[in-house]
Regions:
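Domain-level signal for soluble alpha/beta catalytic cores
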Residues: 1-186
Length: 186
């Protein structure tokens, strides 16, 4: 639909201002697909005066729904008056796809921290409900690969439960940092 830049800024500003009044320290923007939407949020967050982090959701082709690539986002965030303190990817279609995107961010040579928040598996419709098929063990492996791919902020998105997060923490604590993985390994 049609949404003007000014209205998008106003909408993000209203939410960010309320969060600031509520005492938050950092604003978090995620699951964005359009660069215009990301820019409107950046402008609104500048008005509020709080640091922020932002992520986009990338598909199996390494692009957002609106065609943004990891290289595009890495360049885009550096153009804002107040860039995010960290940026990256969330959601998407599975660990291998988000890890490929993280490798794309790292390949740009960014010094800004990279975020990776992958889904716990692939969504399936089962008995009238959405169910994610990822078990905690693969999420632990994902966390290690995300770290080794260059992510500094690692978490989970859709379908991620406390057991997944525990396994991720356990894997990160128990396994030494490794070399940057190849696409074949991912």
């Amino acid at each position: 639909g049609e949404l003007s830049h000014a209205l998008a800024v106003e909408m993000f500003h209203e939410q960010a201002d309320a969060l600031k009044e509520g005492g938050v320290d950092v604003l978090w923007l995620e699951t964005i697909s359009a660069p215009e939407e990301f820019a409107a949020a950046a402008e609104a967050f500048k008005l509020v005066g709080l640091p922020w982090c932002g992520t986009m959701s990338f598909d199996t082709a390494g692009r957002t729904m609106m065609g943004v690539t990891s290289a595009d986002l890495a360049k885009l965030v550096e153009d804002y008056d107040v860039p995010p303190v960290a940026f990256g990817a969330n959601c998407g279609t599975g660990a291998s796809d988000i890890l490929r995107t993280v490798l794309g961010f790292a390949a740009q040579g960014t010094e800004r921290p990279i975020i990776s928040k992958g889904n716990a598996g692939i969504p399936k419709y089962v008995d009238g409900h959405i169910h994610y098929d990822g078990t905690p063990e693969p999420m632990g492996e994902y966390a290690v690969l995300a770290r080794d791919s260059g992510a500094k902020i690692i978490g989970g998105c859709c379908g991620t439960m406390p057991d997944h997060l525990r396994k991720m923490r356990e894997a990160l604590d128990s396994r030494p940092r490794g070399e940057r993985p190849t696409l074949e390994r991912i």
